[in-house]
């Protein structure tokens, strides 16, 4: 009985853990989902963005005390504008999704919402981390030896 309880707790802890992609795995998934060149944004920019926003972690969250919003998932998509978490005052939910969808190991919803973000006038500049860590830099290291 004790062994079954231990096994159950172990399985529960494994399912609660986030998927943390490596850069090449992420680059291949993003390329397969049409992100390379989407709205003029190169694949290396997306990988750089994900590294600096979430360290490639699908379950990353960051609460912003100032406007009481939260950033969700591998791209740290904000609940004030892009998704609904049921907690953020005056949320716009421009992606039309629940924020929990951005925390899945399957990042399809996060990719679709990121595409929606870059269709806005700010484009990829909507992400502070991209402006401070990726913009105007040589990003070739982010996709080097990835076969993409």
Curated annotation (Swiss-Prot):
Gene3D superfamilies: 1.10.530.10. One of its GO terms (molecular function) is lysozyme activity. Residues 1-18 form the signal peptide. Its EC number is 3.2.1.17. One of its GO terms (biological process) is defense response to Gram-positive bacterium. It is an enzyme of class 3 (hydrolase). Pfam families: Lys (PF00062). This is Lysozyme C-1. It comes from Mus musculus.
